[in-house]
């Protein structure tokens, strides 16, 4: 293992959510799993790593939807035509393939390269209808998206207008290539791995912007896709972090930043403005939570922690 490969501390909104919800889960998620991919580690560490790589059916649904939307937008921005029906069939086919892979249990010996579901790992009795409803949620979400103002707006955009398009298609070679074999740059999404974070008082802050584009007047729209079943207000901190990123990395003035959240499952849209006050509040929240997170470290310099209890 490379000496440079270290578990360095960084901040993200999802990390904060885990920290606030359960300290034990936080430890497993960000510390207990480390080195679990190595051969000469205790079985407990390997098992923590294995569990970290698994998805539950709800996060799986969200990942599928995000990937599919990214591919739809990528295709549209490159003027590639996709058959609506064939695309949905291909997405369902991918879900079935991943489901079968999980059912095989291959993730138990190689969790890094094999998809796995927690429901299968724990041998939960999930009704067939539940899985079918999950599939229906995905299809409905894609239909809602293609009927949304965001899809219509993208039809008037060029690739140059797109500032960020998040969606990891690299692990999905077969499905995406089969859908559109002529999409020559299908894996080159405009989001750059080099700028998916910014530094705040020396702390790395990770950001994952689903979609962002710039208007002719220089204003920027940053959009977060949601796929949950519950309706409600979006996470204001998440959206404000997008705004913070835009000011720091793209040098966009606060007054030109427009934040949007769209729940494709519920066809529900929310919009927020960004401001200097909002940026300052976000800054203070991040730094305060960083301080709280580091209080549980046994070695702050090495970013090491021990399991409580």
Please provide the spans of the model-predicted regions.
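Active-site catalytic microenvironments for nucleophilic, acid-base chemistry
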Residues: 71-75, 244-249
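A non-catalytic, helix-rich entry segment at domain boundaries
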Residues: 68-187
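Short amphipathic alpha-helical segments and their helix-coil junctions
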Residues: 5-8, 33-52, 218-223, 293-301
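Non-catalytic protein-protein interaction segments used by genome-maintenance enzymes to assemble
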Residues: 37-41, 176-241, 246
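Conserved aromatic-histidine-acidic binding/catalytic patches
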Residues: 53-61, 126, 130, 199, ...
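Metal-dependent nuclease catalytic regions and adjoining charged, substrate-binding loops involved
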Residues: 217, 231-234, 246-309
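Nuclease catalytic cores
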Residues: 16-32, 41-77, 92, 96, ...
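Generic recognition of stable, solvent-exposed alpha-helical segments in well-folded globular domains
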Residues: 11, 60, 64, 133, ...
């Amino acid at each position: 293992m490379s000496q440079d490969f270290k578990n360095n501390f960084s901040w993200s909104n999802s990390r904060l959510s885990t920290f606030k919800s359960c300290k034990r889960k936080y430890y497993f998620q960000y510390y207990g799993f480390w080195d679990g991919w190595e051969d000469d580690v205790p079985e407990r560490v390997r098992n923590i790593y294995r569990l970290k790589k698994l998805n539950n059916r709800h996060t799986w649904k969200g990942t599928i939807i995000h990937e599919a939307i990214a591919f739809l937008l990528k295709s549209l921005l490159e003027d590639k035509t996709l058959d609506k029906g064939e695309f949905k069939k291909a997405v369902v086919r991918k879900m079935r393939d991943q489901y079968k892979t999980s059912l095989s249990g291959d993730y138990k010996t190689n969790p890094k390269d094999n998809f796995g579901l927690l429901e299968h790992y724990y041998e939960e009795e999930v009704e067939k209808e539940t899985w079918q409803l999950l599939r229906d949620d995905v299809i409905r979400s894609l239909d809602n998206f293609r009927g949304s103002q965001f899809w219509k707006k993208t039809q008037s955009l060029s690739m140059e207008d797109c500032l960020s398009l998040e969606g990891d298609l690299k692990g999905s070679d077969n499905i995406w290539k089969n859908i559109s074999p002529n999409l020559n740059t299908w894996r080159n999404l405009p989001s750059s791995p080099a700028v998916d974070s910014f530094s705040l008082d020396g702390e790395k802050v990770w950001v994952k912007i689903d979609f962002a584009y710039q208007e002719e007047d220089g204003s920027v729209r940053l959009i977060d896709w949601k796929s949950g079943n519950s309706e409600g207000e979006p996470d204001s901190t998440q959206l404000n972090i997008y705004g913070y990123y835009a000011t720091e990395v793209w040098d966009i003035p606060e007054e030109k930043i427009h934040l949007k959240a769209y729940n494709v499952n519920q066809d529900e849209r929310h919009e927020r403005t960004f401001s200097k006050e909002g940026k300052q509040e976000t800054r203070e929240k991040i730094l305060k939570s960083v301080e709280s997170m580091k209080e549980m470290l046994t070695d702050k310099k090495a970013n090491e922690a021990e399991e409580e209890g």
